[in-house]
A protein has these predicted regions:
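Charge-rich (acidic/polar
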Residues: 2-5, 12, 16-216
Length: 216
């Protein structure tokens, strides 16, 4: 039984790869020329998490989307590398040029994705690129403060989405989390001004988590 399952699995994988390899050349070319092959493979693996999430990895659309995401990572690397080079002689100019290129290429990236994906699918790509922090943080906030009003939930989500838009352009996972950290601080200040005692809310939340057998 186990042997048959393994054989069927192997056959299915082979079949999918055959389909993938028989697909026409993707319209979007991978901007890998002149780049370290190991780095390219790392970026491909990272980007494929998004196409896997969308269930399109072994399709022509999936290959184009994969290349768009890979090329975005390559572009970000190029922008930040140029910034670091210019910064040695002119820090102000380096940051200004970096911000300008990030802004212009940001919307180009989303426009490229929109050629193949629906808006909600593009959101999934953004979530994969930012480690699903929007969902995790939003659910944690709602779980911590069950009495949140609908308008407060909407404001929290709006800020998290705004943070995600900035975080997808950040140069590293650390920088991405720093972006979200700033917005989490904004959310905490907002809730405090709304009259919530966050210390008490957090302590009560921890107790509820322990009571249901969860871990903090």
């Amino acid at each position: 039984m186990v042997k048959n399952v393994k054989m069927n699995y192997s056959a299915n994988v082979f079949y999918l790869k055959e389909i993938f390899n028989s697909n026409p050349e993707p319209a979007v070319k991978l901007d890998s020329e002149g780049r370290d092959p190991q780095y390219v493979q790392t970026i491909i693996a990272r980007s494929q998490k998004a196409t896997d999430e969308l269930g399109i990895t072994w399709t022509p659309i999936g290959q184009n989307v994969l290349n768009i995401i890979c090329n975005r990572y390559f572009k970000l690397n190029d922008i930040y590398a140029e910034r670091d080079s210019i910064k040695k002689t002119d820090k102000k100019l380096a940051e200004a040029q970096c911000d300008s290129k990030l802004y212009r290429s940001h919307w180009g990236f989303l426009a490229d994705l929109s050629m193949y994906l629906k808006p909600q699918e593009i959101d999934k790509v953004k979530d994969v690129m930012t480690f699903d922090v929007v969902r995790v943080t939003y659910e944690a906030q709602c779980d911590m403060i069950p009495t949140l009003m609908e308008s407060e939930k909407q404001q929290i989500m709006a800020w998290l989405i705004e943070a995600r838009e900035l975080a997808i352009d950040a140069e590293s996972s650390k920088k991405k989390h720093e972006v979200f950290g700033k917005y989490k601080g904004r959310i905490n200040n907002y809730l405090s001004k709304r009259g919530y005692d966050l210390t008490k809310e957090r302590e009560a939340w921890y107790e509820r988590i322990k009571a249901r057998g969860g871990q903090i």
